[in-house]
Amino acid sequence: MKLLALGLSIVSVALAASRKSAPKGAFTVGKGQKFETISKAVAALSNTTTAEQLIFIQPGTYAEQVFIPKLSGPLTVQGYTTDDSKYSKNQVTIVASESQKTQPGNDLTATLRVWTSDFKLYNVNVRNAFGEGSQAVAVSANAGVSPLRVFSLLT
């Protein structure tokens, strides 16, 4: 029984890992990187490959509205974090300020618009900073979205 408890504690520690560097083959976003905005990394994705694609985002606040179009394969977006089990440790935020005062529908107000299936988002805070007075959403998902894990939505 002690071995089982020790094994479980090792697994839980391993699951609460940091994500400080981009996995091999990832599109990396951040100052001094090939892509300085998330939207530019998304634009560089292949919409014909069925292989998994990955975007890794360095720490920072990214003031942009991000649209993920329909892709042929899975996409994972991973933000920099020192502890991937706590959203309070996330160091990446995407923020925009659209609302139905400026856009004709909910989808167009979203800070993150996802139109592809098999999409995963890890350790990224998504915020619509419009405020009060009109409908404004943080995330709009128009396809089969897989896990959105350890993140916060702020409107």
Feature roles, as predicted:
Residues V13-K40:
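Right-handed parallel beta-helix/beta-solenoid
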Residues S134-T155:
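Eukaryote-skewed repeat-based solenoidal scaffolds used as protein-protein interaction platforms
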Residues M1-R19:
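Fungal secretory targeting signals
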Residues G32-A43, T49-T76, Y80-S85:
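N-terminal extracellular ligand-recognition/capping segment immediately after the signal peptide
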Residues K31, S72-Q135:
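Right-handed parallel beta-helix/beta-spiral solenoid domain characteristic of secreted/periplasmic
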Residues A26, E52-L54, Q65, P74, ...:
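Detector for repetitive beta-architecture
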